[in-house]
Amino acid sequence: MAITDGEASHPGMDRAAAGQLAERRAAETSTALSRLGAAAEIVRLRIPDTGVSRREPEVREALRELVSGFQLCLAPWDGDLHADHEAAGRAARGACAAAGTGLLSYPIWTWHWSHPGDPRVPWEAAARVPLSAEATRRKRAAIGCFASQLRPRGPQRPPVLPPEVVAHFIRDHEMLIS
């Protein structure tokens, strides 16, 4: 599920440009999923970027319907220190509890503010999941599909995700929090 389309990541965009960015992000997501080898249908909620917490009950209900009947859901960690990630994580936690579906969470921005042993991170509930060489290759190819976030937007406009940030995402393992 894509809760938002990330259309607010580029400050100063007008409504038309933000709409175009949302469609570009949706296309990038589809391409990335194919690079991963996933044939999943993407459910787009189109919640406004930066507005997930204001619509959290709606997100929780949509997720509950989606995860019902599944054994496991992966969602952003609700302690990530990014408002939309945290709201998505809380909504997933509530949806999974209501549906009887297991939940594992993944940190996204955590890598930028935490350090080993950081007491804000539940390390005791975390597991390092190694990826095969093929999975790592596919993951890197999928990340490369997000040109709207990886490329500079002009001479004075750096990418949303500079190389030092992307380095956190292209590792040969994932960390999941139970």
Placement of each model-derived feature along the sequence:
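A conserved mid-domain beta-alpha-beta active-site/ligand-binding segment of alpha/beta enzyme cores
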Residues: 114-157
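Active-site beta-strand->loop->alpha-helix modules in alpha/beta enzyme cores, enriched
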Residues: 1-105, 141-145, 157-168
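Residue-level preference for alpha-helix termini and adjacent loops
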Residues: 2, 46, 51, 110, ...
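C-terminal and late-domain segments of enzyme folds
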Residues: 150-178
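Short, flexible loop segments at boundaries between secondary-structure elements
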Residues: 97-120
